[in-house]
Amino acid sequence: MSPAAALTNGSVRQPDLHLVTDDDFVYEQDIQRSPGSTKPWLAYISYKIQHGTVEEQAFVLERACMQLPRSYKLWKMYLTFRTKHIAKLNAAIFAAEYRKVNSLFERALILLNKMPRIWEMYLKFLMKQPLVTLTRRTFDRALRALPITQHNRIWALYRPFANSAAGPTAVKIWRRYMQVHPEDAEDFIELLYQVGYYTEAAKKYIDVLNNPRFTSKHGKGHFELWSEMVELLVEHATEVEAGYETGIDVERIIRSGIERFADQRGKLWVGLATYWIRRGSFERARDVFEEGITTVMTVRDFTLVFDSYAEFEESVIGAMMEVAGQRAEKGVVDEAADFDLDIRMMRFEHLMDRRPFLLNDVLLRQNPNNVNEWEKRVALWGDNHNEVVNTYTNAIAAVQPKKASGPFHQLWANYAKFYERGGDLRSARIIMEKAVKVPFKSVVELADMWIEWAEMELRNDNFEEAVRIMAKAVQAPKRSTVDYFDETLTPQQRVHKSWKLWSFYVDLVESVGTLEDTKKVYERIFELRIATPQTVVNYANLLEEHKYYEESFKIYERGLDLFSYPVAFELWNMYLTKAVDRKISIERLRDLFEQAVEGCPPKFAKIIYLMYGNLEEERGLARHAMRIYERATRAVSDEDRADMFNFYITKSASNFGLPSTRQIYERAIAALPDDEARDMCLKFADMEKRLGEIDRARAIYGHASQFCDPRTTPAFWTKWEQFEVQHGNEDTFKEMLRIKRAVQAKYNTDVNFIASQALARSQQQKQANGHGSGAEDGDDGVVDAMEALERQARAPAGFVAATEGNIKGDAATTNTTVAANPDAIDIDDMED
């Protein structure tokens, strides 16, 4: 064996021949025959792993690596064997054993320094040992030895080692790592933050934010990273080296965010002020707070900045008061410090007094066209004359009439009223004169402005001036073709057609002017075709009050030419009432009523016909009135026709007796729907009964029975039965029953009536249950609709040949009738 082979674990000693047994002879011969081949060594090692001791395995592996030092496979097997052997030993206690393995790795790396797996094994092994410097240097050697394409394998171990080492060592390692992997900058920043390298962390944030290609592996956006940087700068204001040398301008950074991130302005203003507070620059912090509360655009941001400002002032005052208290205890007098405290307290009180104004400023910055907020600002100044005038002046200059939010004309009016209350009517008029020239958003606002001006003159008893102002307001060409709703024209061009303006004008002239002046105004309204029904009524009433009745009637007629129904109905109603009250000639009144009913919709005809008929009854002939009522029954709507027939019948009976109503009843029964015709038949029959015409009444009952289903209208049949009991005989009663069965059979064959029958019976059941114990006998006669139909199908044939009657059902009905009328004749006994 060569001297080199005698090396074991890096030292020279005698060969361990006792580790070679007779069984190893074959393997030793193979090695001698092929000294440069790894195959016999691998076979030898495999045999020893299965049958040899640990010392024998180490002996063979050591010889193999000495014999073939460039064999990666042999070295890996040997190193794995040695590291596994001491894996469970404490690295601090058995440091010597670990150093032996370290020496093996160093020997292996002499020729295998391009093998990343050997480096990884060595580095992992070193990381188990308390050898930070050696481990760091070995990592560096690995990075220098391996090509850059394999550096990731080393960095995967180097980064956890750096984090565990912490401190400056970790920072230096990460700086090198950032050169090849800038995408992990967030982890580096976190490390810098942990070790207190705040300035470098801020610089790294700036580098990241300035790199448009940077993508956060944690999914953070640009704003989130920027916010983290600002938070770092503010929280560690005294530890971050800001200035030209470091390239970190904190105020510029935060102000750029204030301009860029509108929804975060309040938070950023507070952050900037906090930065200066922590650096001890209280005056600069106060300047920042002042700038913040005067520039923020939302109430939320204002509240945030203002509350922080107030808290800052309170803390400063509190600290100064504490120092002042300590001075007082010691008996020390410091007038300058006390004066400074007084100044700060006055400043704080002034700040709190300014809060409503500052808040109002915020709302006006949001929308300078908000009229209501300008009014609130005026109210805040109270009796401060100069500030109120300045506020009104600023408001008028700031508000754009077309974009005004709220009644802009009211702002002008209140401005004028302010001078009016101060007795300066001349200035108020100047304001009003300017106001009516403003291009308001709508004609209504301009009209209100003119009216406000006139009302101001009226309040100061300048009636003629008020009339002159309104005349100027409504001034227009003789034949104006302007469309009131044409938005392309200015309000000043359309205001002369404002009904609100004319209404005020006519009321004003009517109260302070003559009748002729008022008539001219009304006529002008009609010329401009802006009259309303109220205008017509007011004009007519005005003429009537001055005894110009005929002219009043003409006004109604002009109004009727302008308006159609339903407005015309109200005008006709008033016109006809006035005409009748004036007792003009009957012929003229008839002509008016004929005009009124001509083309009148059925919905409105009833009232006019009743008035017409009443006129004929009072001043004409009764026959004429009856003809009018007869026309009314045809002209009115279906809802009013039954009432009209009833009224007609009543009037005919009172004027010409009951017999004269027969034709009316017949027409009503023919014209009305079944439900109303049934009621009309009952009234007709009662009338004939009062006249003693029993047969005619019976015939009417028979006629009405065709649209009276016994199940849904039992009241009709009950009334007919009572009639027959009182005025009939056995034959007539049987005929009534026959008709009843025939009608019931007819309705039973019609599927459309089954549902209505069921509904009627359920209602009867509810009514019977509602009557309590006294209605129990009646409950037996009330049955389910479908059960009744089945019973009818099982019933024997009746005595009416043409139909099949429901005998049992009729018997039940008859029994119910007997229970209700004890005097009725028992037909069943007669038949027996």
Swiss-Prot record:
UniProt subcellular location: Nucleus
Pfam families named in the record: HAT_Syf1_CNRKL1_C, HAT_Syf1_CNRKL1_N, HAT_Syf1_M
Keywords of this entry: mRNA processing, mRNA splicing, Nucleus, Repeat, Spliceosome
Cystine pairings recorded for this chain: none
One cellular component (GO) term of this entry: Prp19 complex
GO biological process, one term: generation of catalytic spliceosome for first transesterification step
InterPro entries: HAT, HAT_Syf1-like_N, HAT_Syf1_central, HAT_Syf1_CNRKL1_C, Syf1-like, TPR-like_helical_dom_sf
HAT repeat ranges, renumbered to this chain: 18-50, 52-84, 96-128, 130-164, 196-235, 245-278, 280-315, 383-421, 423-459, 476-508, 513-545, 547-581, 584-618, 656-690, 692-726
Assembly: Associated with the spliceosome.
Family membership: Belongs to the crooked-neck family.
Protein name as catalogued: Pre-mRNA-splicing factor SYF1
Organism of this sequence: Pyricularia oryzae (strain 70-15 / ATCC MYA-4617 / FGSC 8958)
Organism lineage: Eukaryota, Fungi, Dikarya, Ascomycota, Pezizomycotina
Gene: SYF1
